[in-house]
Amino acid sequence: GLPKLPDNQYKMPDDLLAVCTVLHEEAGEGTVRVVFEPDFNLIVRQYDASFELVLDRDMVLTYQGSNTVSTDALTEQEIEDETKILQIITQMDLSLDQKEFYRSLREMNAEYIVLSSSSAAVSYVETAGCIPVREVEGHIIFRVEEK
């Protein structure tokens, strides 16, 4: 069966808990590699360590303007791919070629993307070839197909 999820002692947002539950239902057992929006990305592993974050925590913080962290642990290719993914999911620049975006997802071995339903990136991600799997608590979970 699925692992029993820990009690919500971290006071995680209910919508994040619901998303985590659905991701486990979809993915089955084992670790799941997920692209989360920055706010979820920074907290999800405190609640559930079976998620592998596609976006490195320090990369997200650097992207958001922090200069107290370092991305030295990442390769140039990882930084490039993660930057492309971030610029889409944060709706900063939706002009990136969708094939490029998809290639970066595949490079980073992303299995799922979770976006806020109201995000301007939703239609971009869908057009790029990600499959919307479920909508839950104001978020859409997309599966990244192996092409």
Spans of features found by a protein language model:
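Extracytoplasmic
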Residues: 1-147
